[in-house]
């Protein structure tokens, strides 16, 4: 039996990325894997640098009995100090997803997307193209949503990001795509899905300009994001989110990138590579058919982890 401790902050993306690795290890390993999850919350202490958090945790867990843990995986900045403290208490192998921001060489492996690597890659770093995607999420459906859909029409989804540290969207950048989708709605069922970052005024303007029969999500507590990736024939996605683009490309569906001007250079470079590799396209007047090798970075990462862990 192989024991894994997964440590995350309260972000859903952190949990999903840890799960992507855990589920793939379970799939390809011959050993039985048991997983324990730990969500960490530090309140005001979370604003401290990781080196200070680590010092505090070493004292806090100084007398904790040694536990049987074979592998520790963590995601989220404040989870990295917990990872190292429990590694010392258990002699487990460990791995952190994304930049731990301290003591990098004390992690057996660090999983980092290429767009976040600024210098030469360290020996303990496993690089990925885009973000890790939990492929089991594609299997999750929503009966409430399925009842709303037109079974006779193929689907086109428009995934809309929003504002944050890395991007800012203005409605004019979406307007042309909305007009295109209005025209395509005679043949296809069009579904819009907003992110948590989408400003309210953008949502209102999209709903105002779109054909009234189009569907808009999330609705209350229902967000069929993964279902839409699974059932859509075509996916339009704004260029402000590497994670949304990575999720879309992991579906193998035909992806159109909707350009956004105010985005960080690393995001712009990522979308440019996607377009150059012809994995996705920018809409040029008609829907096209093309094939590409869908993203499967989790499998590549886990093949390397299997060697490190002797699984």
Segments (PLM) and residue ranges:
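Active-site and donor-binding regions of nucleotide-sugar-utilizing enzymes
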Residues: 6-130
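Catalytic donor nucleotide-activated moiety binding site of glycosyltransferases and closely related
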Residues: 187-221
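Leloir-type glycosyltransferase catalytic cores
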Residues: 271-311
């Amino acid at each position: 039996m192989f024991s894994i401790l997964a440590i995350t902050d309260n972000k859903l993306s952190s949990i999903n990325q840890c799960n992507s690795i855990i589920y793939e290890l379970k799939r390809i390993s011959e050993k039985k894997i048991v997983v324990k999850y730990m969500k960490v919350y530090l309140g005001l202490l979370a604003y401290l640098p990781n080196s200070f958090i680590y010092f505090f945790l070493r004292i806090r867990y100084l007398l904790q009995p040694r536990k049987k843990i074979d592998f520790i995986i963590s995601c989220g900045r404040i989870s990295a100090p917990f990872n190292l403290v429990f590694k010392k208490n258990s002699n487990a192998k460990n791995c952190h997803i994304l930049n731990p921001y301290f003591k990098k060489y004390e992690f057996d492996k660090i999983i980092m997307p290429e767009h976040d690597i600024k210098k030469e890659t360290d020996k303990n770093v496993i690089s990925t193209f885009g973000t890790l995607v939990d492929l089991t999420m594609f299997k999750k459906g929503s009966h409430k949503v399925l009842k709303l859909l037109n079974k006779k029409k193929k689907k086109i989804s428009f995934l809309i990001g929003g504002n944050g540290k890395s991007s800012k969207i203005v409605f004019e950048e979406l307007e042309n795509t909305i007009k295109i989708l209005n025209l395509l709605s005679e043949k296809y069922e069009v579904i819009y899905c907003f992110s948590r970052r989408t400003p309210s005024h953008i949502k209102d303007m999209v709903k105002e300009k779109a054909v009234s029969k189009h569907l808009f999500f999330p609705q209350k507590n229902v967000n069929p994001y993964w279902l839409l990736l699974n059932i859509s024939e075509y996916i339009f996605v704004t260029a402000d989110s590497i994670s949304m683009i990575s999720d879309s490309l992991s579906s193998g569906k035909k992806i159109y990138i909707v350009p956004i001007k105010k985005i960080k250079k690393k995001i712009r470079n990522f979308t440019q590579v996607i377009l150059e590799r012809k994995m996705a396209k920018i809409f040029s007047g008609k829907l096209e058919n093309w094939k590409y090798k869908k993203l499967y970075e989790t499998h590549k990462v886990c093949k390397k982890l299997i060697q490190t862990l002797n699984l």
